Amino acid sequence: MIIFKNLILKISSLKFAITLIIFIAITSGVGTFIPQGNDPQEYIDFYNETPIFGLINGYQVIKLQLNHVYTSNWFLFSLILLCISLAACSFRRQIPSLKAALKWTDYKNEKRFYKLQLTTNYKVSQDVNHILKADSLLRKKGWSISKFENRLSARKGLVGKLGPIIVHIGLIILLIGSAYGNFSSQSKEQYLRLGESLDLINENKNSKFTIKLNNFLIERESDGKPKQFISYLNFFSEEQHLNEIKTTQVNHPIRFRGLTIYQADWSVSNIVLEIDSVLYQLKLKPIPEIGDQIWGLLIELGRENKKNYLLTIDNENGPLKVSNIKDFSEMFIYLNDDPIEINSSKLSLKKIIPSSGLIIKNDPSIPFIYLAFTLIILGTIFSLIPTNQIWILFNENSNKLFVGGLSNRNLLGFKKEFQKLSDEIKNN
């Protein structure tokens, strides 16, 4: 029993909770530094050649579960331990403190007043019921009163005692919600061409609604570098009588019916090329060997003596570069320009079709996260509210009225209020 009590004392201590929070913060940073959820062989290949800090190789990364930090056993255990620490702190300190604050403290002897933070006394007339008048004055100013024949107790701001408990509840919900989200959230990266649609399916394999890319714009800096990507998405469903247009751009996701859609990337997915009076829609692929934002494909051109040419493009406006892979000669085809002849074939570029790169995320823990942060903010605000207490005692023998006050925070502000109330009670 003694061991259990000592364990609870240690777990509920502020030092233990802060240590856990620092540990969780550091390991969360590790989770952002090391890519998460990839194939185990990728970690082995990469970190065996370049170990972390020269010590941790690929096999150790997997053994320590650093390839999935947020769902690892030790990370979840630390979250559970922090929840227990916060709950133990609430039951051991905050709730008893609230219960104590709810009980009225009755000061029957003027000697107790001299031990308070603020105290004053003055001679009064016996003909006036000063306790009754003080009671009326304080009630008008929003104080709660417990009154006796020759004394009263008053308090205000008791909600401040609830603040730490609400913050702890919010933190516990946040930790539970985060852990739940790590296991239940789903994320998918999808590239949509202009006019292309995507059906979103729920767990029962029934179509919830469809999204369609109506328009996609790229804003560029004066030097041509991409500044912003903007997608105009149509959400529609005949069954649900749904038809809405929403816009997403980088750092401004769409939140719709439990889904969050982020603007993540873009690409040139297709081109429409006219070759010898025949239209072809050609699908392009990224070519990272040439550059970061370059797409292209290999094509044969020529009516009799066919040759291989590499078609590449690096933006949504063109031009299309045509490279002979043997002699490295280059030609450029501009959008809607006159046809050019390459190896007896006539080519013209009719259309460039960009794609919007979207990340579609379903995270059922989002309501828990919002609730948690709401509680944390409210609890923090409540915690800033001072709990003030005033006691008034009338001594019939000395004809003196004793007034004393106590505050758990902002003593300077309470001192001004106390002096003002004392003067009003004296002159009332």
Swiss-Prot record:
One of its GO terms (cellular component) is plasma membrane-derived thylakoid membrane. InterPro entries: Cyt_c_bgen_Ccs1/CcsB/ResB, ResB-like_domain. The chain crosses the membrane at residues 14-34, 72-92, 162-182. It is found in: Cellular thylakoid membrane. It is a multi-pass membrane protein. One of its GO terms (biological process) is cytochrome complex assembly. Keywords: Cytochrome c-type biogenesis, Membrane, Thylakoid, Transmembrane, Transmembrane helix. It comes from the Bacteria. The keyword Nucleotide-binding does not apply. The keyword Transmembrane helix applies. PANTHER family: CYTOCHROME C BIOGENESIS PROTEIN CCS1, CHLOROPLASTIC. Belongs to the Ccs1/CcsB family. May interact with CcsA. Required during biogenesis of c-type cytochromes (cytochrome c6 and cytochrome f) at the step of heme attachment. This is Cytochrome c biogenesis protein CcsB.
